[in-house]
């Protein structure tokens, strides 16, 4: 009998700590029999990360035998998984209840198990999504309640991960998936997994809450080429084992069929082929399969409507007719955004297919490309909108069938954490290496179960910790160098290889190029390379055979590269020590290790461990730091591919510049111009060809140099061998700030393409900083030796002498006694621009620059600073300090200042004669305003301003420079009397001039 129970509210008095991920320290005590003995343990990592986890107590040790309650009502597969775990850990199940034993209660929400509700103490799976569960371990009891049978099974998997050496923390967990369908599509080309591999994988999926396994191996003939034919009897037995194992582990076994290679759609032949499709599905249905997929991927035929019609008919006549089959799954012929969409609109096939295919059918797509760096939310939104449904993802990582020499050992990376808004079905395509695929699959389980809390770095570390135990740290060192998949053409995916180590390498090159001390960093890198070799040797000696068989060649490859990296450091140290013999010895080792690595099938750490050797072999202490060089080109390709000119001087052999080839193409002539950060004495240009293609490889060149970027002098012309090796163009030392490489010939991988394209991985310059001659100079300062109080004095400043430079700008500070002088203004001379500012009392900063583009003249006054003498002072000092000039190269040179003494004497005050204004009259009369004008008095010595009156009342005082005033806000057609008087500095006011008038009507 079953009934739905009302769950009691949580009343626990324990302090709770919420966690999302990671390790938690807690105290564990034994329950039942209390010993009083306490030990510190860790709540282990869990995968996938639970949605909610609370620590509610100290934890306890599970007794050697337990009371098991609910096993008859609970999901059979969940109980079987629990019993298997208990047996493996030597924990027996009591035949009768023992109050001194740990009690474990298990069941689903609808089961009538009072003990389960009591142990849950208010925590419940009742309101969770399908496949959710609640798990409570507290006070010697463990309760696992599933929302459904799948949820109970997943609760058992979490319980298994929680228990370490019979210790379990006291926790409350409520957990449920973000994405409904989570799992694997075995859809890679190449060697299919063995039957043993698949059985092992299916168990692994169940343990990590993955519920979908799509059986679609490209090299299974009965899936693709022989899709019409039934499986032979021996194959049917194998298939039955997979189906049964999937059911036991709560994994939907999805049988995939790919009929598109030769299916017939019309007439009797079409009907015959459709019946073959039904018959194939019927045979699998009879074996227990309840999920099916029909794929149209990787075929030439683009009959969109017919593809969709086959699906719709199969959906009606088989899927819906059966009643217990899950929604049909498909992959269209256009299955990535690049193929599906053009200019934001669906292409013809995708539009017709999307309009025709039944809304209940799951449609898979791979993201922006077939193998791509990311799925941004915008991309998912676009495709979901076209198909008007939540999409299913076929994520092509960690698959390696397009780049077989490398292993993909990284985490899920580049996937938006809000993807579940448009996706409710997430699968990954694994490698043919089943065991090593588990690292990425482990992180895929975490991402798809708890998307919002996914952290790719934590997930990756946790996966390796849980999969490799004592070898985890060694495996992290190895796998860290094999996470990025990049076949140099259309496929790029995964986290970059060893990003922290790559950053240290880049820092080393920067320090060496900048002539900084790099000794500590070199020692650190020696340690890194030694650790790489040690880790790989440990793995070779201790990895289980199934894993070692899959990675032994890559382990050997990384050992070789680590040895080459150490030899590369030896080369650098020898260069620093100017030890030619040691350098040549280390160089030979490094080159041999690189050659061995490049000739191997195995690929690993191309842009890190391998690239470091290549960089070291081409490194020269005379190399001018590429990252300080500004580089421009006759053209660059930034539309068809990301290949700007800057990539030819970034220190990275894996990037490159390409002349513009997208429409409209630039077919020549081609050139690169490098602007150095200073003037150098150069003698060599390095050209590193693009490493992944010969297209645009430079075979003819002309090198020219310049000091000003406009006038270039040719220093070398010649030809280069047509291969991928680094080339050096050497010539007699010459001074240069600009270096131009003109392409006179290049090769192409296209017919008639010679000379039309140009590429370069790196173009670098070697030389030494030009030691500039010392620039010296002095300042001139001209002023009268004596000035009267109240008078202005002009202080003329210029460049007296300048040696080994020409000045295009001049910056100085004029200092004066603020009690003796007041700053008035600065005056420029012809052909120069002067900008002056009083920066504080007694200091004026003056900037002088050329207006003509010619150098500033020497031995001339360039600027005049006007000061007013304010007080009698004997021997007041004027000085020029902080004096510097800017030359034509943009360099600044300090030059010597100077000083001068000026005496300020009392002056005789001139006689002030008071006179009235002249010609006082109205120039404009309006209704409300009257404007009056006048001429200044006959004598102006001491004149300070004017006082204006209206009808006998003073209305304004204005300055002496004014000769007009407007009386405003007057009444219309009214008589007014206006007067004006001149005011003088001795306090006297002149007689008033008068004017009477009437405003306008």
Swiss-Prot record:
<dbReference type="InterPro" id="IPR029018">
    <property type="entry name" value="Hex-like_dom2"/>
</dbReference>
<feature type="coiled-coil region">
    <location>
        <begin position="515"/>
        <end position="543"/>
    </location>
</feature>
<dbReference type="Pfam" id="PF07555">
    <property type="entry name" value="NAGidase"/>
</dbReference>
<feature type="binding site">
    <location>
        <position position="335"/>
    </location>
    <ligand>
        <name>a protein</name>
    </ligand>
</feature>
<dbReference type="GO" id="GO:1901135">
    <property type="term" value="P:carbohydrate derivative metabolic process"/>
</dbReference>
<feature type="binding site">
    <location>
        <position position="429"/>
    </location>
    <ligand>
        <name>a protein</name>
    </ligand>
</feature>
<dbReference type="InterPro" id="IPR051822">
    <property type="entry name" value="Glycosyl_Hydrolase_84"/>
</dbReference>
<dbReference type="GO" id="GO:0030246">
    <property type="term" value="F:carbohydrate binding"/>
</dbReference>
<dbReference type="Pfam" id="PF00041">
    <property type="entry name" value="fn3"/>
</dbReference>
<feature type="binding site">
    <location>
        <begin position="394"/>
        <end position="396"/>
    </location>
    <ligand>
        <name>a protein</name>
    </ligand>
</feature>
<feature type="binding site">
    <location>
        <position position="187"/>
    </location>
    <ligand>
        <name>a protein</name>
    </ligand>
</feature>
<feature type="region of interest" description="Catalytic domain">
    <location>
        <begin position="179"/>
        <end position="469"/>
    </location>
</feature>
<comment type="function">
    <text>Binds carbohydrates. Capable of hydrolyzing the glycosidic link of O-GlcNAcylated proteins. Can bind and deglycosylate O-glycosylated peptides from mammals. Can use p-nitrophenyl-beta-GlcNAc and 4-methylumbelliferone-GlcNAc as substrates (in vitro).</text>
</comment>
<feature type="binding site">
    <location>
        <position position="401"/>
    </location>
    <ligand>
        <name>a protein</name>
    </ligand>
</feature>
<feature type="signal peptide">
    <location>
        <begin position="1"/>
        <end position="30"/>
    </location>
</feature>
<dbReference type="InterPro" id="IPR015882">
    <property type="entry name" value="HEX_bac_N"/>
</dbReference>
<comment type="similarity">
    <text>Belongs to the glycosyl hydrolase 84 family.</text>
</comment>
<dbReference type="InterPro" id="IPR011496">
    <property type="entry name" value="O-GlcNAcase_cat"/>
</dbReference>
<keyword id="KW-0378">Hydrolase</keyword>
<dbReference type="InterPro" id="IPR017853">
    <property type="entry name" value="Glycoside_hydrolase_SF"/>
</dbReference>
<dbReference type="InterPro" id="IPR002102">
    <property type="entry name" value="Cohesin_dom"/>
</dbReference>
<feature type="domain" description="GH84">
    <location>
        <begin position="180"/>
        <end position="452"/>
    </location>
</feature>
<dbReference type="Pfam" id="PF00754">
    <property type="entry name" value="F5_F8_type_C"/>
</dbReference>
<dbReference type="Pfam" id="PF02838">
    <property type="entry name" value="Glyco_hydro_20b"/>
</dbReference>
<dbReference type="InterPro" id="IPR036116">
    <property type="entry name" value="FN3_sf"/>
</dbReference>
<feature type="binding site">
    <location>
        <position position="218"/>
    </location>
    <ligand>
        <name>a protein</name>
    </ligand>
</feature>
<dbReference type="GO" id="GO:0000272">
    <property type="term" value="P:polysaccharide catabolic process"/>
</dbReference>
<feature type="coiled-coil region">
    <location>
        <begin position="573"/>
        <end position="597"/>
    </location>
</feature>
<feature type="domain" description="Fibronectin type-III">
    <location>
        <begin position="916"/>
        <end position="1001"/>
    </location>
</feature>
<dbReference type="GO" id="GO:0015929">
    <property type="term" value="F:hexosaminidase activity"/>
</dbReference>
<dbReference type="InterPro" id="IPR049019">
    <property type="entry name" value="NagJ-like_helical"/>
</dbReference>
<dbReference type="InterPro" id="IPR008965">
    <property type="entry name" value="CBM2/CBM3_carb-bd_dom_sf"/>
</dbReference>
<dbReference type="Pfam" id="PF21774">
    <property type="entry name" value="NagJ_C"/>
</dbReference>
<feature type="binding site">
    <location>
        <position position="297"/>
    </location>
    <ligand>
        <name>a protein</name>
    </ligand>
</feature>
<feature type="active site" description="Proton donor">
    <location>
        <position position="298"/>
    </location>
</feature>
<protein>
    <recommendedName>
        <fullName>O-GlcNAcase NagJ</fullName>
        <ecNumber>3.2.1.169</ecNumber>
    </recommendedName>
</protein>
<dbReference type="InterPro" id="IPR008979">
    <property type="entry name" value="Galactose-bd-like_sf"/>
</dbReference>
<dbReference type="Pfam" id="PF00963">
    <property type="entry name" value="Cohesin"/>
</dbReference>
<keyword id="KW-0732">Signal</keyword>
<dbReference type="InterPro" id="IPR013783">
    <property type="entry name" value="Ig-like_fold"/>
</dbReference>
<dbReference type="GO" id="GO:0102571">
    <property type="term" value="F:[protein]-3-O-(N-acetyl-D-glucosaminyl)-L-serine/L-threonine O-N-acetyl-alpha-D-glucosaminase activity"/>
</dbReference>
<dbReference type="InterPro" id="IPR003961">
    <property type="entry name" value="FN3_dom"/>
</dbReference>
């Amino acid at each position: 009998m079953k009934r739905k129970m009302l769950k009691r509210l949580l009343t626990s008095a324990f302090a709770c700590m919420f966690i999302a991920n990671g390790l938690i320290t807690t105290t564990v005590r034994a329950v039942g029999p209390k010993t009083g003995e306490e030990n510190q343990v860790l709540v282990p990592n869990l995968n996938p990360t639970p949605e909610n986890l609370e620590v509610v107590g100290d934890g306890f040790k599970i007794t050697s035998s337990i009371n098991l309650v609910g096993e008859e009502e609970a999901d059979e597969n969940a109980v079987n998984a629990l019993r298997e775990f208990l047996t493996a850990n030597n924990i027996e199940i009591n035949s009768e209840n023992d109050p001194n034993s740990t009690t474990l209660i298990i069941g689903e929400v609808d089961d009538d198990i009072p003990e389960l509700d009591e142990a849950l103490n208010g925590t419940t799976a009742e309101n969770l999504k399908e496949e959710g569960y609640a798990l409570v371990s507290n006070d010697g009891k463990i309760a696992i309640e599933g929302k459904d049978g799948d949820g109970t099974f997943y609760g058992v998997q979490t319980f298994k991960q929680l228990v370490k050496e019979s210790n379990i923390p006291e926790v409350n967990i409520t957990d449920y998936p973000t994405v409904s369908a989570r799992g694997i599509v075995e859809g890679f080309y190449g060697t299919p997994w063995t039957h043993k591999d698949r059985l092992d994988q299916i168990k692994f999926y169940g343990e990590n809450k993955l519920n979908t396994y799509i059986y679609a191996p490209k090299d299974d003939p009965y899936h693709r080429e022989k899709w019409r034919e039934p499986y032979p009897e021996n194959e049917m037995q194998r298939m039955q084992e997979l189906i049964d194992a999937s059911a036991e582990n709560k994994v939907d076994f999805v049988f995939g069929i790919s009929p598109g290679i030769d299916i017939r759609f019309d007439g009797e032949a079409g009907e015959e082929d459709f019946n073959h499709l039904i018959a194939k599905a019927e045979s699998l249905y009879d074996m227990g399969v309840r999920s099916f997929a029909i794929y149209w991927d990787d075929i030439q035929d683009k009959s969109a409507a017919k593809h969709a019609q086959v699906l719709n008919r199969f959906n009606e006549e088989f899927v819906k007719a059966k009643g217990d089959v899950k929604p049909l799954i498909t992959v269209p012929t256009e299955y990535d955004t690049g193929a599906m969409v053009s200019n934001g609109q669906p292409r013809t096939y995708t539009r017709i297919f999307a309009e025709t295919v039944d809304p209940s059918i799951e449609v898979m797509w791979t993201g922006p490309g077939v193998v791509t760096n990311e799925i941004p939310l915008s991309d998912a939104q676009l495709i979901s909108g076209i198909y008007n449904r939540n999409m299913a993802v076929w994520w092509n990582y960690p698959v390696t069938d397009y780049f077989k020499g490398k292993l993909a050992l990284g985490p899920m990376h580049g996937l938006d954490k809000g993807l579940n808004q448009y996706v409710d079905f997430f699968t990954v395509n694994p490698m043919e290496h089943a065991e090593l695929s588990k690292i990425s699959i482990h992180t895929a389980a975490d991402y798809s179960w708890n998307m919002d809390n996914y952290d790719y770095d934590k997930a990756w570390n946790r996966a390796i910790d849980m999969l490799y135990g004592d070898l985890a740290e060694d495996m992290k060192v190895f796998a860290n160098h094999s996470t990025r998949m990049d076949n140099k053409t259309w496929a790029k995916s995964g986290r970059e290889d060893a990003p922290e180590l790559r950053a240290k390498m880049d820092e080393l090159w920067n320090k060496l190029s900048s002539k900084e001390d790099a000794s500590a960093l070199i020692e650190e890198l020696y340690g890194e390379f030694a650790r790489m070799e040690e880790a790989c040797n440990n793995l070779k000696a201790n990895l289980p055979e199934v894993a070692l068989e899959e990675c032994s060649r890559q382990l050997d490859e990384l050992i070789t590269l680590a040895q080459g990296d150490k030899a590369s450091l030896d080369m650098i140290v020898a260069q620093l020590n100017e030890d030619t013999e040691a350098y040549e010895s280390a160089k030979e080792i490094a080159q041999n290790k690189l050659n061995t690595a490049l000739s191997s099938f195995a690929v690993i750490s191309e842009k890190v461990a391998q690239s470091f050797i290549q960089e070291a072999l081409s490194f020269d202490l005379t190399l001018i730091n590429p990252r300080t060089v500004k580089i421009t080109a006759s053209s660059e390709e930034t539309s068809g591919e990301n290949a700007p000119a800057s990539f030819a001087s970034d220190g990275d052999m894996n990037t490159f510049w390409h002349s513009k080839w997208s429409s409209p193409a630039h077919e020549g002539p081609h050139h690169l111009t490098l602007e150095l950060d200073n003037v150098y004495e150069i003698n060599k240009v390095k050209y590193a060809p693009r490493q992944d293609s010969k297209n645009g490889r430079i075979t003819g060149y002309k090198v020219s140099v310049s000091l000003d970027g406009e006038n270039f002098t040719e220093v070398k012309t010649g030809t280069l061998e047509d291969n991928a090796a680094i080339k050096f163009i050497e010539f007699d030392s010459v001074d240069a700030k600009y270096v131009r490489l003109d392409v006179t010939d290049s090769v192409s991988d296209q017919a008639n393409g010679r000379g039309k394209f140009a590429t370069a991985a790196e173009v670098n310059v070697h030389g030494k900083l030009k030691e500039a001659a010392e620039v010296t100079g002095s300042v001139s300062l001209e002023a009268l030796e004596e000035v009267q109080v109240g008078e202005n004095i002009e202080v003329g400043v210029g460049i007296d002498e300048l040696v080994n430079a020409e000045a295009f700008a001049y910056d100085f500070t004029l200092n004066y006694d603020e009690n003796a002088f007041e700053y008035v203004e600065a005056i420029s001379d012809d052909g120069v621009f002067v900008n002056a500012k009083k920066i504080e009392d007694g200091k004026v900063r003056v900037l002088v620059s050329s207006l003509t583009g010619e150098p500033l003249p020497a031995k001339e006054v360039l600027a005049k600073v006007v000061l007013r003498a304010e007080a009698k002072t004997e021997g007041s000092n004027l000085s020029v300090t902080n004096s510097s000039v800017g030359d034509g190269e943009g360099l600044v040179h300090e030059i010597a200042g100077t000083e001068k003494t000026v005496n300020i004497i009392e002056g005789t005050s001139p006689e002030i004669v008071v006179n009235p204004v002249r010609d006082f009259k109205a120039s404009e009369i309006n209704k409300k305003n009257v404007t009056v004008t006048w001429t200044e008095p006959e004598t102006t010595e001491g004149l300070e301003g004017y006082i204006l009156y209206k009808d006998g009342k003073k209305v304004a005082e204005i300055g002496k420079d004014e000769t007009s005033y407007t009386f405003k806000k007057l009444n219309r057609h009214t008589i007014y009397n206006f007067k004006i008087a001149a005011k003088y500095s001795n306090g006297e006011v002149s007689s008033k001039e008068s004017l009477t008038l009437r405003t306008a009507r």
